[in-house]
A protein has these predicted regions:
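Donor-nucleotide binding loops and adjacent catalytic segments primarily
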Residues: 1-61
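Peripheral, non-catalytic segments that deliver or gate enzyme domains
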Residues: 2-12, 88, 99, 116, ...
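Residues at alpha-helix caps and immediate loop-helix transition turns in enzyme cores, especially N-
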Residues: 9-12, 93, 145
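A donor-sugar binding/catalytic signature common to diverse glycosyltransferases
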Residues: 47-96
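C-terminal amphipathic helix plus adjacent low-complexity
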Residues: 113-170
Length: 170
């Protein structure tokens, strides 16, 4: 998925399709703009939307733009990530997931040779797989995370506000 803000995704999808073909892998391309996608072989599905929470646990890896939401969902699914950032916070997110050992960062243009090499590395690297599963195991479930957030907000509400008024009183 190139993300919702990518306006020129033709090269990304063309390169990804060639990389999947080279590796003999199936894939699912997600975009609301099918005009950006070249004709695809039957091994690659094109969909405008699929819930990542349903898709990722059944996936071997994820190639994406590096947005924080997609990155977090892949962490929760415990799968390797190949981030191809192009804007905003994506560069920082991609660098961080690489430093964590859960994936790789591949800057644009993400050509098919580089995509296939990086994806093959991620799919074969046992240390990356183990690191992804370890991070997944350390993540709180939605209910636990919500409970912790509520506890944090309630504790913060008990503390007096320091709005700087005391410094200005006189």
């Amino acid at each position: 998925t190139p993300g919702s803000t990518m306006l020129e995704g033709q090269g990304f999808f063309r390169g990804a399709a060639k990389a999947l073909r080279k590796l003999g892998r199936r894939g699912i391309f997600l975009t609301k703009d099918p005009a950006q996608v070249p004709p695809l072989p039957e091994e690659i599905l094109l969909r405008p939307y699929v819930p990542m929470s349903a898709l990722l646990p059944r996936s071997a890896a994820l190639v994406h733009h590096g947005g924080i939401g997609t990155t977090a969902l892949a962490f929760a699914a415990g799968i390797p990530q190949l981030a191809t950032p192009f804007a905003h916070d994506q560069f920082d997110n991609a660098t961080r997931l690489e430093r964590l050992g859960c994936g790789l960062r591949l800057d644009a243009p993400a050509e098919d040779a580089a995509l296939s090499e990086a994806l093959q590395h991620l799919l074969e690297d046992e240390q990356v797989a183990a690191t992804c599963k370890d991070l997944q195991a350390r993540m709180d479930s939605g209910a636990v995370a919500c409970a912790k957030a509520v506890d944090f907000v309630e504790a913060a509400a008990q503390r007096p506000l320091d709005n700087g008024a005391q410094a200005h009183a006189g």
